[in-house]
């Protein structure tokens, strides 16, 4: 396991020498994330952290390759323009908004490796925790969906260290919103990309805390009856892929809003296999049905507008199976949506 600092050579895009200064792209704004007091002094509001690990996918019998995604998602995002609203809102502050915190790597030699995933999750969690404590929003770039347990641990650590009371009853109610075709609450003798939310449930139960989990885009063809039984036992809020397609937006939005209202802070995670394989072919477990990108964007904006999101991540992009960088570009668009909505909500 290792951490590499941000490779700023990935942050490139087109030049606009004949346009006004408002022809800005994200590659022109990104800086190294400073894991010290200067991040607060400089006003860094966003910290990107890569989780270059797909050991969990391998353990979950999936198709590997997601560990190569973080730099490619960054590259696709870097070339996107900065919207006018952000330029107006943060005039004079733009170069300090976004920091790249580099990548956590899992050196498993493309084979099953004991403890490598677990150590990578802990090291990734440490970066997430530091960014939260410094007042920023950490956004993880996977990698497999085992990133989810690391994101949660980072949030949990930050809450433990910032809470003045040792009494866990005083902790804010954590809500998890996951866009995913899979529930990811499998039983297994080791951690995998299919177990993170069961692990989170067990962690919270040990701490006497409730498990508030809403999974959006769940496919009945991607989860066994045993998993749906476990979801019922754990009290999981499920919005199926068919609901996302067939129900009116107002009804779905009300369900999401009710969940948001029931918690104090939110961990938002997007498994890119929630989208149809025709839209994102490059994922670890492609979906035959999926939910529309327009729906995901609309729901993400609703969630971000609550002001409760404290950590977010995007997982399961697999460049090995991508076509014309299509999947990385969709991930970059969702990353931009999260960043834009978070900053505009400050």
UniProtKB/Swiss-Prot annotation:
* Enzyme Commission code: 3.5.3.8
For this protein, the record's SUPFAM superfamilies field holds: Arginase/deacetylase
User: GO molecular function: any one?
Assistant: manganese ion binding
- Residues where Mn(2+) 1 binds: 145, 180, 184, 271
If you read the UniProt record, what top EC class would you report for this enzyme, in one word?
Answer: hydrolase
Cofactor dependence is on: Mn(2+)
Its recorded reaction(s) are: N-formimidoyl-L-glutamate + H2O = formamide + L-glutamate
Classification via InterPro entries: HutG (IPR005923), Ureohydrolase (IPR006035), Ureohydrolase_dom_sf (IPR023696)
Entry keyword set? Histidine metabolism, Hydrolase, Manganese, Metal-binding
Tell me the domain of life: Bacteria
Alphabetical GO biological process terms: L-histidine catabolic process to glutamate and formamide; L-histidine catabolic process to glutamate and formate; putrescine biosynthetic process from arginine, via agmatine
Q: List the disulfide bonds.
A: none
Residues noted as binding Mn(2+) 2 in the record, renumbered to the chain = 180, 182, 271, 273
Q: How and how many cofactors are bound, per the record note?
A: Binds 2 manganese ions per subunit.
In which pathway is this protein known to take part? Amino-acid degradation; L-histidine degradation into L-glutamate; L-glutamate from N-formimidoyl-L-glutamate (hydrolase route): step 1/1
Q: Can you tell me which family this protein belongs to?
A: Belongs to the arginase family.
Q: What does this protein do?
A: Catalyzes the conversion of N-formimidoyl-L-glutamate to L-glutamate and formamide.
| Official protein name in the record | Formimidoylglutamase
Q: Which organism is it from?
A: Psychrobacter cryohalolentis (strain ATCC BAA-1226 / DSM 17306 / VKM B-2378 / K5)
């Amino acid at each position: 396991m290792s951490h590499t600092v941000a490779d700023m050579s990935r942050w490139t895009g087109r030049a606009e020498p004949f346009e006004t200064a408002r022809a800005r792209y994200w590659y022109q704004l990104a800086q190294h994330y400073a894991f010290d007091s200067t991040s607060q002094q400089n006003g860094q509001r966003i910290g990107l952290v890569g989780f270059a690990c797909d050991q969990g996918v391998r353990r979950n019998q999936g198709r590997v390759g997601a560990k190569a995604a973080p730099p490619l998602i960054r590259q696709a995002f870097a070339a996107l323009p900065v919207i006018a609203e952000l330029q107006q809102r943060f005039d004079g502050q733009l170069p300090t908004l976004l920091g790249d915190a580099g990548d956590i790597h899992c050196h498993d030699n493309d084979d099953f490796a004991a403890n490598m995933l677990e150590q990578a999750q802990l090291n990734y969690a440490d970066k997430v925790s530091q960014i939260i404590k410094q007042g920023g929003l950490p956004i993880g770039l996977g990698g497999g969906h085992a990133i989810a347990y690391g994101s949660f641990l980072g949030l949990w650590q930050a809450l433990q260290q910032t809470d003045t009371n040792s009494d866990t009853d005083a902790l804010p109610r954590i809500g998890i919103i996951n866009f995913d075709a899979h529930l990811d609450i499998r039983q297994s003798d080791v951690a995998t990309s299919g177990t993170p939310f069961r692990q989170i449930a067990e962690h919270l139960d040990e701490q006497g805390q409730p498990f508030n989990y809403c999974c959006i885009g769940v496919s009945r063809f991607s989860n066994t009856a045993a998993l749906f039984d476990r979801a019922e036992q754990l009290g999981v809020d499920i919005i199926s892929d068919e609901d996302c397609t067939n129900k009116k937006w107002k009804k779905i939005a009300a369900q999401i809003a009710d969940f948001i209202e029931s918690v104090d802070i939110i961990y938002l995670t997007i498994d890119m296999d929630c989208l149809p394989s025709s839209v994102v072919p490059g994922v670890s477990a492609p979906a035959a049905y999926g939910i529309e990108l327009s729906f995901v964007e609309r729901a993400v904006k609703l969630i971000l507008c609550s002001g409760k999101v404290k950590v977010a991540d995007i997982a399961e992009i697999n460049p090995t199976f991508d076509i014309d960088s299509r999947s990385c570009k969709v991930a970059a668009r969702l990353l931009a949506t999260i960043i834009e909505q978070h900053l505009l909500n400050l």
